[in-house]
């Protein structure tokens, strides 16, 4: 509050940060200023975190200077920091308003496991599918829930890569007349795609449709959606849309032939 009163609202966040560093130092309060740390899983860097402060290894304040209100993305950002630093308490502070606005947050860790799922018939390489699911399952079992989508994408990449399969990050493809369009899925062994979502309720139709778009333009037969929610984790196998339609047409034809022969 003293920093807000001394500086006034609405300036660059860095000014408030520097003033807080000076105030904490003068008061003899132990703190880390913008500590940058890597999240490493099985020797592979999955993400990098840099909170504004870690104070007395007890709580994490994050400084903002906003025109509007705190958003869910701000909360997710702080929860990621708390999970990584293994701290429960954090504080969002907004220097953008006439009065100092702050919100105290408490992080609670959750663990999860995937329900055992057999690859469906359209999966052309069941062994690779099983390897992917097992690797990612071990990762979520070890790490627990709470990270954002970008962090989980890095963790999934690290988990799969650590057990052998080749992983291509952000593959590109030609879409209609547009060259080099980047897809957010991971491509595994040039065989399938993996799409990662997080902090939503569950895998939904949009998630499946997005992966199908990636499969279509990357010319891959199948893929897996992994979702890491607030309290649960789940997965779904997805087929290339044209392959799926072809299979459905074949089943209808076969069904029609059976009906004719029975008459």
Where are these regions (language model features)?
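Active-site metal-binding core of divalent-cation-utilizing nuclease and nuclease-like domains
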Residues: 3-58, 98-109, 125, 137, ...
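Residue-level marker for well-ordered alpha-helical positions
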Residues: 18, 75-76, 134, 154, ...
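Short, structured coil/loop segments at alpha-helix boundaries
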Residues: 41, 70, 122-126, 208
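Nucleic-acid nuclease catalytic cores
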Residues: 60, 64-111, 197-248, 252, ...
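A short, charged helix-loop
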Residues: 112-120
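A short mid-domain helix/strand-loop element embedded in enzyme catalytic domains
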Residues: 125-133
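Long, low-complexity, intrinsically disordered segments
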Residues: 258-263
